[in-house]
Each structure stands twice: as structure tokens, then as C-alpha cells.
């Protein structure tokens, strides 16, 4: 095994020979990262990406200045989907080491799960992986139910069944109950709902290759809320939380749903399908109906829902939508505490009416007359939240996955959002 490259921190600038903008320097003892006090965590993450790019796969974080957040920033930049990497961590106190270990276990699970090929990760596998992760941290405080295939249709989960029926891999609804109180009648504090489309071809509204090649990641919302619940549990979550994952493939076959089909939901809403590639909202609707029935204090849904959110924010921020200003402010405060990027986008009452249909109450996509695609998608979802004006947050996960590497991230999943949602749950 190769000897570890030592990585140390310094608050002094690099020697002038490295240039005035140098963020790291190399000497016989290893590599020094030169912190400037302005964006130290970002600097560490970007430097780690460069170190990995040099082919250095075994490092030792050495010397003073390392804490859990700085170690984590290094790992976020250092980790990549190909190859193996080894980090020898510095001495941390017990609380910081436990925090770091939990991030490594859970957020790496999120990244690895999102990066998994669709051939390996179908709807049933995603649901079972979620159960395994949360059971690992919660033990007997968890119960769950998995409903799949024709049972979904018989029980009225028509959005999920309609989208997923074309695949040989049956659609699945995971309903998981984390109840640390032990009281079956305990109120539900929060419900988490995740879009788990394990591959999205677009259906008959088929995607071009350039937009389909990353669609193994279309279950990023489900992975994110699963990781968030698991991480909140490790931080001492003592309230009852329910998790609903809406898992399916969106494929083409003789049995696939078609443009012009009308879906009737359990809350009485009828939706005309005018774009089979706007399938995420169709499956989330089923999960949101179940979440609303629990009468929780808050509902958080997460989904890689629209290209419009990425157009607005790139892959750098998650988009946040809510009618509840106070709750949105709490989530943004949690994001700031966890150093994760969220940005609130508009959601108003008029967005709820910008999905007109000639044949049903709602259309599943906005027309050219209503181009605010991310906002109208959120408006669509609001029709399936009983008290949508209070206690509901919608996260359009535009920062979940990167098709290509950038200066601070490798290609693939980021794991962003897990800590923010966990922070909100435990605040």
C-alpha cells in the first residue's frame, strides 16, 4: 500500500512562487491548503477535487485546524464514483467523530444509491434499500408496508400504477413509520414524500438521448428524504415521522400510459395526461394524499421534478417552494446552518390554475401560455395537499446530480439536502 499523502491546513498564504491566487502548495512533507477565511469549506472541497485529479488516492488529514465540517468538505470533493480512496482522519472529539461517521455512512449511501445503474436499482430494490438503511439506525422503532403492482391499482394509487405499469418491474409504494414513542396513537410530526423514478425514458413523450442518459438519477428525491430521515435519527429525532416513497420506472410498452389518458385520484381529482414525461408529479400525488391523511405538522416532498428549476438555478441550488413563509424561512435557516444551497422560487395561488384541461380538472403540464414550469409543477402538487397553505414544503432537487465534474464535485450524485432536512426535523 502506498504511503499516505499528508494534507495540512494553514492560514498563511502560499509562497509567492505558487502565485497570488494559490489555494494549495506542495512540499516534501505533503500538501498544504491555504485558507483565506472567506470560504474555507469551499476552498477545502475544491482542493480535494484537485488532489483526486492528481491521482492521489490515499491521504492523511494531519496537523491542527481540522474539525468535522472541514473533514466533510474534503470528503465531498475527494469522493468520486470510480476507483477507491482512503482517508486517514485526524483526531476529533467523540461528538465530532460520531457526526462525521454518520455523514459518511448515510450521505455516502445517498450518493451511491443515486449513482447506481438502473439495471441494478429498480423500484423494489430502492424501497428495500431505504428500509435497510433506516432499520440500521432505528432498529425496532420502525415499521413499514410495501405495496406493489396490481395491489396499487386495487387500493386506488392510480398515479403510481399508471406511470409504472409499462415496466416489467412493478411500481412500488413504501410507507415507513418511524415511531420512537412506542405509542401507536402518537401524532405524526412530519411526513416525507419522495419521487423514486428509477429510470425515466419520458414514456411516449420520449426524451432525447442527451436528456435521458442521466435518468437513473430520477429517484434522487426518494434517496434524499430517506437519507434525511436516517440522519435525523442519528441526531436524536424523538418525534414520529412517516416516509412515503413513490417508486416506478417510466418506460414505453404496449401497456404504457398515453397522452389524453385521464387519471382519477383518491381525493377525487381528475388529471389529463398531456405529457408522459411529466410523470413525477403523477406519482408524488399519491404520496401526498397519504401524507395529508396523517394530519402532520409538516409535509416535505422532494423530487427531481423539472428542468425549469435547473434552468433557473443550475445544479448549484435546490429549489424551494412553499405557501408557508414561516416554514420556508425555517428550512432556509437550516440550510444556512448546514452550509447547503437552497433558493426559494415563486409559488402563488395563480400557479394552481395554470394547468387547464378541456377534459379533466387538471392537466399534468402547463401550456406555452404558462411557461413557469417549476412553479406550475409545484402548483399541481398543491392540489394533493389537504392544507397546502400551511406546513408544506416542496423541494425540486436541482442540485442532486451532476452529469459532468466541476471544480468542487465529481460527476454524479452530491448528497446535498440530506443535512438540511434532518436539521429541520430535529430543530
Curated annotation (Swiss-Prot):
Cofactor binding note from Swiss-Prot or TrEMBL: Binds 2 manganese ions per subunit.
Cofactor(s) required for function per UniProt: Mn(2+)
One biological process term in Gene Ontology: proteolysis
Pfam families documented for this protein: DUF3663, Peptidase_M17
EC number: 3.4.11.23
GO CC aspect terms: cytoplasm
UniProt-listed Gene3D superfamilies: Zn peptidases (3.40.630.10)
Keywords: Aminopeptidase, Cytoplasm, Hydrolase, Manganese, Metal-binding, Protease
Subcellular location, principal: cytoplasm
MF annotations from Gene Ontology: manganese ion binding; metalloaminopeptidase activity
PROSITE patterns recorded: CYTOSOL_AP
Binding site for Mn(2+) 1: 200, 277, 279
Residue numbers binding Mn(2+) 2: 195, 200, 218, 279
Catalytic residues in the record: 207, 281
Record's catalysed reaction(s): Release of an N-terminal amino acid, Xaa, from a peptide or arylamide. Xaa is preferably Glu or Asp but may be other amino acids, including Leu, Met, His, Cys and Gln
Subcellular location: Cytoplasm
Role description: Probably plays an important role in intracellular peptide degradation.
Family that this chain belongs to: Belongs to the peptidase M17 family.
Assembly and oligomerization: Homohexamer.
Name of protein: Peptidase B
Chain's gene name: pepB
